[in-house]
Swiss-Prot record:
The name this protein goes by in its record: Cilia- and flagella-associated protein 45
Keywords recorded for this protein, A-Z: Cell projection, Cilium, Coiled coil, Cytoplasm, Cytoskeleton, Flagellum
Biased segments, Low complexity type: 8-18
Signal sequence extent: none
Upper taxonomic lineage: Eukaryota, Metazoa, Chordata, Craniata, Vertebrata
Length: 551
């Protein structure tokens, strides 16, 4: 449907208004290039038309000029397309009426003509023979030129005295040639096997050295552990010795304290006996007075008897309370004594028996004192009883202090043993961590070496496959050459014989050269300081033999 001018102007204004609010059109390229062969060309007139649908374009510009002059130039049909943001003209594509035309260049046409020629087997063989003879002639000419150039160069070198710089350059060139020859020889299969054997021997040597180093480290760790165990044992024995010394001093102090208490008791008994004698004398002096005051004394004795009963009840209550506290303390001490060693328990048991015996003796003495106090009539009996009770309390205080110190020492010993146990666990954990790190390093190193060996084996395998393919192709070529050589003259057979002899000499020289290089590599391996057993193993695997002369 054709567009009106008004519609075009309105659409253009609308497009311009919208283009202000939207992104403007981006220019991708200032010009465009199109392959004109894609659109075809004008067909030639019926006078020059042939049966072939192929049209060869010799000169596009000349054809276009001719058609323009004759008024036969094809005019393209276009359509104007107006969109919101731009106006474009589109070319209507044309079609070939026959649908059989094909436009190609002259070069392509010549190539198709040349490829369309079908040669017979004899022509192919003749072409191959001609190409082969041409190659052989070229190679022979090149060989002759090389020989002539070498002879001229040798003559020139022999006749000319070299300068210092030229001598250095010649030595450098010879060194480069030797290096190139060495690198070329390194590509031989035997030397590759030799290098692989040497690398394997070095890997084994490194692995054995790592194993020895690991064993040495383990040995040092074991020695260090034994030394620490010995130090801990010495420390434990010294601690036990100090503990025994403290026990001995404590027992001596207890014995001295008990001896002092016994001496005080004996002294008090002597004083009481003296007082008893003195009282007897007073009794004798006061018999008259006692007779007179007998009634009063009986009342007073009854009162004192009641007081004594009360006092005995109070003493019994105090003794029961002391026994109960002592039983509780003994229970606590037994609970604490369970955490110490067995020999301490036995000592405490013996001391408990000794204390029980002393307690029994003390009770017997108290009974005796009570009996003597019952016979006495004065207040001094109560004082003696108070002295005995005070001595008993002092003994109990000393016992409690001793048990407290024992408990503190046992607690300190338990804390020391706990610290030693923690230190031991930390040492074991550190040793396990060090060993795990060393094992991980060894594993990583082994995996790296194994990965490198695998990569090298894969590369060698690929090279062997390539070489096998090359050998197969070479063998096929040799078989073809043998068949051709069988058809040649006897002179060619003689030349083949000479070539075989030369190849044999070269193979023998190559073998000798390889053997020399193997021996040189073995000497270099020995010079690196590798143990002799690995060198012998490399020599055995490489089959290094003495060089033999060529007859």
């Amino acid at each position: 449907m054709p567009l009106r001018p008004g519609d075009a102007s309105s659409s253009a204004s609308t497009a311009s208004n919208r283009s202000r609010t939207r992104t403007r059109y981006r220019t991708k390229a200032m010009n465009s290039e199109v392959d004109e062969s894609l659109f075809g060309g004008v067909k030639p007139s019926s006078q020059g038309k042939s049966d072939s649908p192929i049209v060869v374009i010799h000169d596009k510009h000349a054809i276009r000029k001719t058609l323009s002059a004759l008024g036969l130039e094809h005019k393209t049909e276009t359509i104007q397309l107006i969109t919101r943001d731009m106006v474009r003209e589109l070319i209507v594509p044309t079609e070939d009426p026959s649908g059989e035309s094909l436009i190609i260049s002259p070069e392509e046409f010549e190539r198709i003509k040349w490829a369309s020629q079908v040669l017979t087997k004899e022509e192919l063989n003749a072409r191959e023979q001609a190409l082969k003879k041409e190659k052989e002639g070229i190679l022979e000419a090149v060989t002759i030129r090389k020989k002539i150039m070498k002879q001229k160069e040798m003559t020139w070198n022999n006749n000319k005295k070299l300068s210092d710089l030229e001598e250095v350059a010649r030595e450098r060139a010879q060194n480069l040639l030797q290096r190139a020859d060495k690198l070329r020889m390194e590509q031989e299969e035997e030397l590759k096997d030799m290098s692989k054997i040497i690398l394997n021997a070095k890997c084994h040597a490194i692995r054995d050295a790592q194993i020895l180093e690991k064993q040495q480290i383990q040995k040092e760790l074991d020695e260090e552990e034994r030394r620490l165990d010995h130090m801990m044992e010495i420390d434990r024995r010294e601690s036990l010795q100090r503990q025994e010394d403290r026990e001995r001093k404590r027992r001596e102090e207890r014995v001295r304290g008990k001896r002092h208490i016994v001496e005080q008791i004996k002294k008090n008994e002597e004083e009481r006996s003296l007082q008893a004698e003195h009282r007897e004398q007073e009794k004798e002096q006061m018999l008259a007075y006692l007779d007179r005051l007998q009634e009063e004394d009986l009342q007073d004795l009854e009162r004192r008897h009641q007081e004594k009963l009360k006092m005995q009840a109070e003493i019994k209550r105090i003794n029961d309370e002391n026994q109960r506290q002592k039983a509780e303390m003994l229970a606590q001490e037994r609970l604490a004594d369970q955490m110490v060693m067995e020999f301490t328990k036995k000592k405490m048991a013996r001391e408990a028996e000794y204390e029980a015996e002393q307690e029994k003796i003390r009770r017997e003495k108290e009974k005796e004192i009570a009996r003597l106090r019952a016979l006495q009539e004065k207040a001094q009996d109560y004082q003696a009883e108070q002295d005995a009770l005070r001595a008993k309390r002092n003994q109990e205080v000393a016992d409690r202090e001793w048990r407290r110190k024992e408990k503190e020492n046992a607690q300190k010993k338990i804390e020391t043993e706990e610290k030693l146990r923690k230190s031991r666990l930390e040492q074991v954990a550190f040793k396990e961590h060090t060993l795990a790190v060393q094992v991980q390093r060894d594993r990583d190193e082994f995996e790296r070496i194994l990965r490198a060996q695998r990569e090298q084996i894969e590369r060698e395998k690929q090279e062997q496959e390539k070489k096998a393919k090359g050998c197969l192709q070479h063998a096929n070529e040799l078989r073809r050459q043998v068949r051709e050589n069988q058809q040649k003259h006897v002179q060619n057979r003689l030349a083949t014989f000479e070539e075989g002899r030369r190849l044999k000499e070269e193979a023998e020289k190559r073998r000798e050269r390889i053997e020399d290089i193997k021996k040189q590599k073995l000497e270099e391996l020995r010079a690196t300081g590798l143990p002799e057993k690995y060198c012998i193993e490399v020599e055995r695997k490489a089959n290094i033999l003495p060089a033999t002369s060529v007859n």
